[in-house]
Swiss-Prot record:
PTM description: Phosphorylated by host kinases.
Places the protein is found: Virion; Host cytoplasm
The protein's name in its UniProt record: Phosphoprotein
Compositionally skewed regions (Basic residues) per UniProt: 1-10
Length: 269
């Protein structure tokens, strides 16, 4: 081999020996045995410095701490800070504490205001409902009392007006609010002819039956004890509502009426 350069005729620098590549992986592991193994994720978190707790964590921790209630917020805050060993606060720390206390007071005031407002609204609603119910009851009681008084009036005109008021029917009246005892008193005060008219109207319009054969029975009024007397008055007040509210009773009364007819001898008219 030529050991001199062509141009300068100076000797060439020595060529380093070429190292053969390592083909056995075991040899490589042996060479790296003295290096530290990489840490897994859990180990890295373990050796890392702990992170600072968040504000939520601190708040949750303080919620579990004992505190003396019944004192102003600043007194309770100072007592709690003294228990933690934070006696000397900087101006910035005091400002942060003041912001927290003020926000707590505002939240408490808002909650109290919302609760009080809801209580007032509910109370007003209940009072209005009770007042409306009492007004309706008094109005209907006054109407029944007026009708009762007119039925006992010596004036024929007054009695006729009372009967017209009973049989006319006021569809705007809520019969569920009427006093049953008051309606029964009205029935007792009515004359016999007026009662017969009320019964005939009830049988034909409410039970929807033909009472012609029934009237042929001697003492037919004695066989109507399955109909409460206040039903005649209530049906005259609001027949549409009566048919809806007392539909089951109407079905039972119609069946009872048919049983009475089937047990009595039929009379040819």
């Amino acid at each position: 081999m030529n050991r001199y350069s062509r141009r300068s005729r100076h000797p060439n620098p020595p060529v380093p020996n070429q190292e053969e590549p390592e083909r056995d992986p075991n040899h490589i592991d042996q060479d790296l045995a003295d290096l530290a193994q990489p840490l897994v994720l859990k180990e890295r978190h373990a050796v890392m410095a702990p992170t600072q707790p968040s504000l939520s964590d601190v708040i949750n921790e303080e919620r579990q701490a004992p505190i003396t209630f019944g004192n102003p917020p600043e007194v309770m805050a100072n007592a709690r800070l003294s228990a933690l060993g934070y006696d000397n606060l900087t101006e910035r720390e005091k400002r942060i504490l003041a912001v927290g206390v003020r926000c707590g007071e505002a939240a408490k005031d808002y909650h109290s205001l919302t609760t009080t407002k809801k209580w007032i609204e509910d109370e007003l609603k209940s009072q209005m409902v009770a007042l409306a119910s009492s007004t309706r009851t008094l109005t209907e009681a006054a109407s029944l009392h007026t009708t009762f008084a007119m039925l006992h009036s010596p004036s024929i005109k007054r009695k006729a007006e009372a009967m017209s008021h009973i049989s006319q029917g006021e569809e705007s009246i809520d019969i569920s609010k009427l006093n049953k005892t008051g309606m029964e008193d009205i029935w007792v005060a009515m004359e016999s002819e007026s009662k017969e008219d009320a019964v005939d109207t009830y049988l034909r319009n409410i039970l929807e039956v033909d009472p012609t054969q029934f009237y042929a029975i001697d003492g037919w009024g004695l066989y109507l004890d399955f109909i409460p007397t206040w039903h005649y008055i209530a049906a005259g007040k609001n027949s549409a509502q009566f048919k809806t509210s007392y539909a089951d009773e109407i079905v039972e009364q119609r069946a009872a009426f048919e049983r009475v007819l089937s047990k009595r001898p039929r009379v040819e008219i």
